[in-house]
Amino acid sequence: MAHKKGGGSTKNGRDSNPKYLGVKAAGGSVVNAGTIILRQRGTAIKPGNNAGLGRDHTIFALVDGTVHFRNGRNNKKRVDIIPS
């Protein structure tokens, strides 16, 4: 006869890997063309002047310059790059 009960199983014990989303270059910081400014899911913040949108909704700089966040039309947030 066994002296211990069976170990059983659990439905817990796993976790997803971190996705490292968020702002990578704050407003006022100087960036080069191609620098990632923001990683996000969906387009909570849209690209403005001199900023591009990647296929995973990443916003990046198209020119060298300074990052500027602003509220666009209908209270939509936008990111501009002011050329230096």
From Swiss-Prot:
**Which UniProt keyword terms apply here?**
Ribonucleoprotein, Ribosomal protein
Matching entries from Pfam families are given as: Ribosomal_L27
Q: Name one GO biological process term.
A: translation
Cellular component GO terms, alphabetically?
ribonucleoprotein complex; ribosome
Q: Name one GO molecular function term.
A: structural constituent of ribosome
Out of the domains of life, which is the source? Bacteria
- Where do the segments described as Disordered lie? 1-20
Q: Which HAMAP family does the UniProt entry name for this protein? A: Ribosomal_bL27
Similarity-based family: Belongs to the bacterial ribosomal protein bL27 family.
Q: What is this protein called?
A: Large ribosomal subunit protein bL27
